[in-house]
């Protein structure tokens, strides 16, 4: 009996052992087969080849951004065509040079060839603030009321930057100079050649030059208020320009400036033949001002015929040669604004016309209370 039980237990245990071995063996065997990787070696090189192929494709995409000399690659920056002609030439010259060192050497060349500024003009008023080196800029009108600049610096490199601006801006009318935005510095591609402080110095020079041009324009308007008739140039201020740099004109302290600017009338009885009906540009100007300013009084007078000797005569600038206008606007929109800011508002509204052949405006901008 005991033997039978013993054999039974043994048999039972013997049956369990093979079962357990079989169980673990069956579990372990597939694990061993999973460790066999007959396909892995062939797959890995294929995967790596895919990565290499992708890298080669991405490498081919890199060159277009480096071809930054193309104006179209600058996106929303100010178009080169809006810059003064000489400044356009300089920008294109720098864009054609890929090596930063070559651009640096060109600046040095400009600096060495810049005519020194007379010491009497190296004053605090002419000094550019925020530059690493000392820089002075002087501005004055030539006989045709174009701005002429002179500059100097105690650093050859900074002198080169000043010379670049003097060369690019001199001989141009005030509106062209004031339309320039800081974008032109990006178009030059000098970021790799100059330190951040030098780049900021270049922009500070531009701001002072624009400020001086605006001062000349305002002074010219003050002189014209003496009663002498003279050609009036428009004042346009770029949006990127800091308002802190724009001189304010107190209307109360200078009433004659508002009263006499561009108010010369044409006597219909004596000069009826000179009265010009508004053409397409004149009508657009009138409609724009009526819509945006809701004026109490609005006069738009085409005086382009008075400037027959000007570069833009009738028929040469599109819109039947409509290039010069007298504007008289009485509107509540001018309330609390200085003369300069009133001009700025008007020219912001007429930007499309300014870009398409409008050369000059004589503006009288008043509030109803000032009439």
From Swiss-Prot:
Subcellular location: Plastid, Chloroplast stroma; Mitochondrion
InterPro entries referenced in this protein's UniProt entry, alphabetically: BolA, BolA-like_sf, Fe-S_metab-assoc_dom
Record note on modification: Glutathionylated. Glutathionylation strongly reduces the stimulation of NFS2 activity.
Pathway per the UniProt entry: Cofactor biosynthesis; iron-sulfur cluster biosynthesis
Keywords: Chloroplast, Glutathionylation, Mitochondrion, Plastid, Transit peptide
GO cellular component: chloroplast; chloroplast stroma; cytosol; mitochondrion
Biological process, per Gene Ontology: embryo development ending in seed dormancy
Active site: 131
Targeting presequence: 1-66
Entry-annotated residues carrying S-glutathionyl cysteine: 131
Free-text disruption phenotype from the record: Embryonic lethality when homozygous.
GO molecular function: enzyme activator activity
One Pfam family hit: SufE
Quaternary organization: Heterotetramer with NFS2. Interacts with NFS2 and NIFS1. Interacts in vitro with GRXS14, GRXS15, GRXS16 and GRXS17, but not with GRXC5. Interacts in vivo only with GRXS14 and GRXS16.
Similarity comment text for this entry: Belongs to the SufE family.
Described purpose of this protein according to its UniProt entry: Participates in cysteine desulfurization mediated by NFS2 in chloroplast and NIFS1 in mitochondrion. Activates the cysteine desulfurase activity of NFS2. Cysteine desulfurization mobilizes sulfur from L-cysteine to yield L-alanine and supplies the inorganic sulfur for iron-sulfur (Fe-S) cluster formation. Glutaredoxins regulate SUFE1 activity by inducing its reduction and deglutathionylation.
Further comment found in the protein's record: Over-expression of SUFE1 leads to retarded growth and chlorosis.
This protein's name: SufE-like protein 1, chloroplastic/mitochondrial
Gene name as annotated: SUFE1
